[in-house]
């Protein structure tokens, strides 16, 4: 996930056939087992993908990591602006995702679970998913 969307997804789906079967994998810092986070990710995908393609999509959400010290100036600035905006929100307005961002700001965090790739591999290996 990048700035609330799946980077490049909107342009990618424009090139697909109307009945294309696709796998969408999101990777972000948000807890992928938190229903509110899942709902927010799905809303973002719904804005980027036409319904006819979404109906044939298999969607997975994975957690990634971030090392703030390795971000370029543009992204460090974006993160600083976002952090300064959300840290002053009232507690009842802070989502789990926002709280996690505040807690991990300016740190190196790694939530990567390579075992989570197994479910994606399983779907890819199911020939029926991509049979014409």
Residue ranges with predicted function:
Residues 4-132:
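FMN-binding flavodoxin-like domain, especially the glycine-rich phosphate-binding loop
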